[in-house]
Amino acid sequence: MTDSLGDILADLLDEIEAVEVSATREYARDGVPFAWRPEENVLELRLGVDIAEAAMRTPDAHVSERGGAWVRFTPGSWDEHARDRAQAWFRVAWRMAEGGG
């Protein structure tokens, strides 16, 4: 099953409470940004330095211009593996943003 990034994020927003989405498609919890969708098929997530470092050893994960705690995720298609990583990383980033990150 192949989803779009929009489908994946919509499902996550149905599941997770307390997510603020800005007009620039930045996702925040209690005012703390934890994810950003700068392009239609690109997702950036604030995972913390250690997790981001490990995440960058997986396919389609790159350094983000936002800093070492962020990962830029750019899969060629949103297949099952990409969907699983996007969902897991979004949840981790959301949890880490609690209380100011």
Spell out what each predicted region is.
Residues M1-G101:
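Charge-dense, helix-prone N-terminal extensions
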